[in-house]
Curated annotation (Swiss-Prot):
Chief location category: membrane
Example GO molecular function: potassium ion transmembrane transporter activity
Family statement drawn from the similarity comment of this UniProt entry: Belongs to the HAK/KUP transporter (TC 2.A.72) family.
Key words, A-Z: Cell inner membrane, Cell membrane, Ion transport, Membrane, Potassium, Potassium transport, Symport, Transmembrane, Transmembrane helix, Transport
Annotated localization: Cell inner membrane
Protein name per its UniProtKB record: Probable potassium transport system protein Kup
Parts of the chain that traverse the membrane: 17-37, 56-76, 109-129, 147-167, 174-194, 215-235, 256-276, 288-308, 346-366, 378-398, 403-423, 428-448
Length: 631
C-alpha cells in the first residue's frame, strides 16, 4: 500500500490485465487468506455451534451473503465512489467528510473523532493481520508432520521478524511477484473448492438466504454472536478502499468479481462440503480439503500468500501514517524513500518497530490463529463502522443525495455493520481487548498532538507583533541589511515570527529579502504545481509565501520555492538561509489540556522529527532558534 505514486502512474498506462493482476497482489491479500481460519473458527471458536447439516448450510449462507452485501454491495457500489481526488482510505475519507460538514462545527468534530478512531483501529489490525495470517499458514505443518506443535510459534516468529527486518530495503524487487503469486493462490482456492463441492454438491443450497435465517431461528442464543466469527471472512475489505488511489476503482472491482469473489465462495463451499461429509475435518477444513500429495505445496503457497497479505498491511500503515502526519494528527517522523523510481514507496522506522513489537507479543501471547481470531473481529468491524458513518455524511452533505433515497439505504448499511460490531463486543473480554486498547492509546496520542499543536500556536500568537506595525517600524528606523534571502517558517500569516524577532534582537541585521513562509496542508491528496505557491509582496523587501501541499504530497520546500514567479526573489541555495523556531513546552496549570496530556504533548514534541528533515531543507543553510512556551 505504500506504492502510491508508482501505482497511480501505472493506473494510467498499464494494460488492464496487468493492472488487474497487480491489484490482486496488493489489494486482496488479507481477505484472500481468510479461508485459512474462518470456517474453523466458526465451529471451533467456542460458540457452541454443533457440526450438523443445517448448521453448516446456515453458516455458509451467512458467509455468502456477508460477502455479497458488505463487499460487493457496500464497498463496490458506494464506498469506492467516495474517493478524495482518486485517493481512498479512512484518513482521505475523513478529510472528505470534514470538508462536507464544514458548515456544521459539531458534526465536523464528530467526523474527525470517527475518522481518527477508525484509523487507530487500523493500526491494531496491522498488528493482528500478520500474526494470525502467518500462524494459520504454519499450522498446516501440524497435519503434515507429527510432533511439530511446539515449533509453530518459533517458525512463525522467524518469518514475521524477517518480514519486518527487510522493510527498510523496500519491496520493489520482490513486489513484482505479488500479483502472480496471489492469482495462483486464488486459482488454487477455487480449484480446491470445486474439488470439495463435487463430493457433496448439496452445499450449494446455502446460496438461498433462507438457510441463514433458519440458522438464527435454530440458534436463538448464539445467532448474533456467530457473526463475530463470520466477519472473519470480511477481514481486508477495508483494503479495497484504502488502495483505490493506487489502482483505481475499475481494476479493483473487476478483480473482485472476475477472480477473487468466485474463488472465495468456491473455497468456503468446498470446505463446507468436506465438513458435511466428514465432521472430524472441522479441526482444519482448509488444509484437509487438499489431497494428501498437495499438502506441503499448499502450505508453501499459503505461507507466501500470508506474507504478501502482511506486507500489504504493513505498507498500508506506512502510507496512513504519512497522511496523518501531513494532516497534523501525528508528530513528524523520519520518512525513508525505498525506491528511486517510485516516490510513493516509503519506510517509517518508528512505525515498523512498533508494529513488529506488537506482532511478536501477539504471537507469543495467543500462540494460535484460533485464539487470535477473537481479537481480530473487533478492529475490523470497528473500522468498517467508522467508514460507513463517514460515507453517510459524504453521501448526504457532499453528494446531496435525496434523503428519501439515501436515509433508508444508510440505515440498512449501518444496521448490518452495527450487528457485526455488536457481535464482536463480547470478544473484548476474550482477547479482543488488545486492538481496542491499542486503538484507544493511539486515539489519545493523535488527539493530544492535534490539540497540543493548536494550543501551542495560540500561546505563541499571544502578544505577537502584527506584521504591518513591524514593517512600518522598519521604514522609520531601517536596520543594517545583509545580502541574501532569509526564509522564516511560521504558522501565522499576519504576525512576525518569533525567530525573526530573535534574529533582530541578537544580530541587529535583516537580509535584503525576508520571506515569511507558511506551509498549508489541504484536505485533498495532491495539489497541482500551478496551485502550489502564493506570493505577496509587502514592500521593504518583505514577502509572504504560502506553499500548498496535499496529504500525500512530498513536502519539498526548496523545490516548491523554486516555483515562485517573482523575479526579484532569489532562492538560489548559496544565497538562502532558513530560520526555524524550536519550541520547548513547559506544562503548567493554565487552561488548555489536563496536566498529564500537556506532559505527553511535551514529550511528543521533544521527540518529533524537526522541520529541517521533513521539509528537505539543506542542513548547512539552516539556523534554529529555541523558545520556551508555557501551556
Amino acid at each position: 500500500m505504500s506504492q502510491t505514486n508508482s501505482h497511480g502512474e501505472a493506473a494510467g498506462t498499464a494494460k488492464p490485465i496487468g493492472l488487474l493482476i497487480a491489484a490482486v497482489g496488493v489489494v486482496y491479500g488479507d481477505i484472500g487468506t481468510s479461508p485459512l481460519y474462518t470456517l474453523k473458527e466458526v465451529f471451533q471458536g467456542g460458540y457452541g455451534v454443533e457440526v450438523t447439516h443445517d448448521a453448516i448450510l446456515g453458516v455458509l449462507s451467512l458467509i455468502f451473503w456477508s460477502l455479497i452485501w458488505v463487499v460487493s454491495f457496500k464497498y463496490m457500489a458506494f464506498v469506492l465512489r467516495a474517493d478524495n481526488q482518486g485517493e481512498g482510505g479512512i484518513m482521505a475519507l475523513m478529510a472528505l467528510a470534514r470538508r462536507a460538514s464544514a458548515k456544521h462545527p459539531k458534526l465536523q468534530m464528530m467526523m474527525v473523532v470517527f475518522g481518527l478512531f477508525g484509523a487507530a483501529l487500523f493500526y491494531g489490525d496491522s498488528m493482528i493481520t500478520p500474526a494470525v495470517s502467518v500462524l494459520s499458514a504454519m499450522e498446516g505443518l501440524e497435519l503434515a508432520f507429527d510432533g511439530l506443535d511446539h515449533w509453530i510459534v518459533p517458525m512463525a516468529l522467524i518469518v514475521l521478524v524477517g518480514l519486518f527486518l527487510i522493510q527498510r530495503h523496500g519491496t520493489a524487487r520482490i513486489g513484482v511477484l505479488f500479483g502472480p503469486v496471489m492469482v495462483t493462490w486464488f486459482l488454487v482456492l477455487g480449484a480446491l473448492g470445486v474439488y470439495g463441492i463435487m463430493q457433496s454438491p448439496e452445499v450449494l443450497k446455502a446460496v438461498n438466504p433462507a438457510w441463514g435465517v433458519n440458522f438464527f431461528i435454530i440458534h436463538p442464543g448464539i445467532g448474533v454472536a456467530i457473526l463475530g466469527a463470520v466477519v472473519l471472512a470480511l477481514t481486508g475489505a477495508e483494503a479495497l478502499y484504502a488502495d483505490m488511489g493506487h489502482f483505481g476503482r475499475k481494476p479493483i472491482s473487476r478483480a473482485w468479481f472476475i477472480l477473487v469473489l468466485p474463488a472465495l465462495l468456491l473455497n468456503y463451499f468446498g470446505q463446507g462440503a468436506l465438513v458435511l461429509g466428514n465432521p472430524e475435518t472441522v479441526r482444519n477444513p482448509f488444509y484437509l480439503l487438499a489431497p494428501g500429495w498437495a499438502l506441503l505445496p499448499l502450505i508453501g503457497l499459503s505461507t507466501m500468500a500470508t506474507i504478501i497479505a502482511s506486507q500489504a498491511v504493513i505498507s498500508g500503515a506506512f502510507s496512513m501514517t504519512l497522511q496523518a502526519i501531513q494532516l497534523g494528527y501525528i508528530p513528524r517522523m523520519h520518512i525513508q524513500h525505498t525506491s528511486s523510481d517510485a516516490q510513493g514507496q516509503i519506510y517509517i522506522g518508528a512505525v515498523n518497530w512498533a508494529l513488529m513489537a506488537g506482532v511478536i507479543l501477539l504471537v507469543i501471547g495467543f500462540e494460535s490463529s484460533g485464539a487470535l481470531a477473537s481479537a481480530y473481529g473487533v478492529a475490523v468491524t470497528g473500522t468498517m463502522l467508522c467508514t460507513t458513518i463517514l460515507v453517510s455524511t459524504v453521501m448526504l452533505m457532499l453528494w446531496k443525495w435525496p434523503p428519501l433515497l439515501a436515509v433508508p439505504l444508510l440505515i440498512c448499511l449501518l444496521l448490518v455493520d452495527g450487528l457485526f460490531f455488536a457481535a464482536n463486543v463480547p470478544k473484548i473480554f476474550q482477547g479482543g481487548a488488545f486492538p481496542v486498547l491499542a486503538g484507544a492509546v493511539l486515539f489519545i496520542l493523535m488527539t493530544t498532538w492535534k490539540r497540543g499543536k493548536q494550543l501551542l500556536a495560540e500561546r505563541i500568537d499571544e502578544g505577537g507583533l502584527p506584521l504591518p506595525i513591524f514593517i512600518s517600524s522598519i521604514r522609520v528606523q531601517p536596520p543594517h541589511r545583509v545580502q541574501g534571502t532569509a526564509v522564516f517558517l511560521t504558522a501565522r500569516s499576519d504576525a512576525v515570527p518569533h525567530a525573526l524577532l530573535h534574529n533582530m534582537l541578537h544580530n541587529q541585521v535583516l537580509h535584503e529579502q525576508v520571506v515569511l513562509l507558511t506551509v498549508v496542508y489541504e484536505d485533498s491528496p495532491r495539489v497541482p504545481a500551478a496551485q502550489r505557491v502564493e506570493v505577496e509582496s509587502y514592500g521593504e523587501g518583505f514577502y509572504r509565501v504560502i506553499l500548498h501541499f496535499g496529504f500525500i504530497d512530498e513536502p519539498d520546500v526548496p523545490a516548491a520555492l523554486a516555483l515562485c514567479d517573482l523575479p526579484e526573489l532569489d532562492f538560489s541555495p548559496m544565497r538562502t538561509t532558513y530560520f526555524l523556531s524550536r519550541e520547548t513546552v513547559i506544562p503548567s496549570k493554565m487552561d488548555g489540556m489536563a496536566r498529564w496530556r500537556e506532559a505527553l504533548f511535551a514529550f511528543m514534541l521533544k521527540n518529533a522529527n524537526g522541520n529541517l528533515r521533513f521539509f528537505k531543507l539543506p542542513f548547512n543553510r539552516v539556523i534554529e532558534l529555541g523558545t520556551q512556551v508555557e501551556m
